[in-house]
């Protein structure tokens, strides 16, 4: 393979059989259980990178079922998204996500900078309850429950919430272990067809784990729960802040 061929095929690894395809990345019947809770403000501040800013000490704990996604297949993920603002615009910062499918782990980390790890999340309806669970190895570290479709939410309002920007801290090391990429990435969910939105009584339990520290942001109070079903496209990202380009980086 000559240099020109290497460059023309340089999208993902292995170069002869990439772990994930090129987009666009469309999701059909993507189902969310989002439980918003109040947490310790000091602990929250310690995990949100500048220049993002936090307001109320809230966390969205998410269980997401994706039965039909372009190139990524059928999988489920779970994790924490923190409401933030960047230059006065409200959005969400993804702290960590845990999922059960390699292509979106590889693609998520390499393309956007999603902080993804391999685990075993489940989202399913049990009789009258929507139940989300997350196991890391043999350990149950998250359980979320919501009464199934107790009350319908306004679709236009919920769609607007899905359209806000999302932020990721993309970190990729150089071959010597020093940072090669350290960037704040912004992306959007696009072409959203919100098919349903509901709320109901909810509860969330998080358990400590050394390698999956979801409980490091403790649940002090559940303030909201949402069950959403939508078709959408996961848009590609843009770099809004380069940490290695800052004066502090040269002083390391």
From Swiss-Prot:
Pfam families: ADC. It comes from the Bacteria. It catalyses: acetoacetate + H(+) = acetone + CO2. Gene3D superfamilies: Acetoacetate decarboxylase-like. Keywords: Decarboxylase, Lyase, Schiff base. SUPFAM superfamilies: Acetoacetate decarboxylase-like (SSF160104). Its EC number is 4.1.1.4. One of its GO terms (molecular function) is acetoacetate decarboxylase activity. The active site is at residue 116. The keyword Lyase applies. Catalyzes the conversion of acetoacetate to acetone and carbon dioxide. Belongs to the ADC family. NCBIfam families: PRK02265.1. This is Acetoacetate decarboxylase. The gene is adc.
